[in-house]
Amino acid sequence: MKEKLLMGNEAIGLGALHAGVGFVFGYPGTPSTEILETVAKNKGEGVYVEWSVNEKAAIEAAAGAAYAGARSMVTMKQVGLNVASDPLMSLTYVGVKGGMVVVVADDPGPISSQTEQDTRHFAEFAKLPVFDPSSPEEAYQMIGDAFALSEQLGTPVLFRPTTRVCHGCVSLQMEDCSKRITPEGFIKDASRWVIFPRLTYQNHQKIEA
């Protein structure tokens, strides 16, 4: 165990690496930017990191990795979820195989954004679980739980740190190692991945249950 002084965004990035994330996609925007940067600086061999052209492209790329059984993460600020909402809503119905966490950093105030939005309303709208850490310590601990819950339920999970969580600094005790997860790979199966028309109705019943 090592003790490190970390910004909340750094804690999220390192927590994702320690949880075995294999693919990270994002679009920069305060207060979320340092999460992907931290992963890029600290990643080991076999971890893919990408600044995507926009949030929609980022979430679609992460979904592809999760379909193959890898743990994937997307990072963006709150207004970016507006751009990514189309694939997010479809993912609710399709589901995932590997853990997929969509980190959306909210900016109450707003302090550095054009609007104030609450991602928890998006989670309710999409019928997705949401983690809402209240401190950098909780963010580090919860990110691994978010991947585990995503795999347990077979659905993406939203993760909502706010500006003060993202940019607050704390001293954290953490493991100095990352979990290694080897994805099974994508298995072509029309009954599992072709959502329309039959699976749309079936999965709608599960979502609304």
Describe the residue ranges of each PLM region.
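Thiamine diphosphate
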Residues: 1-136, 141, 162-165, 178-179
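Flexible, low-complexity linker and terminal segments
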Residues: 2-9, 133-209
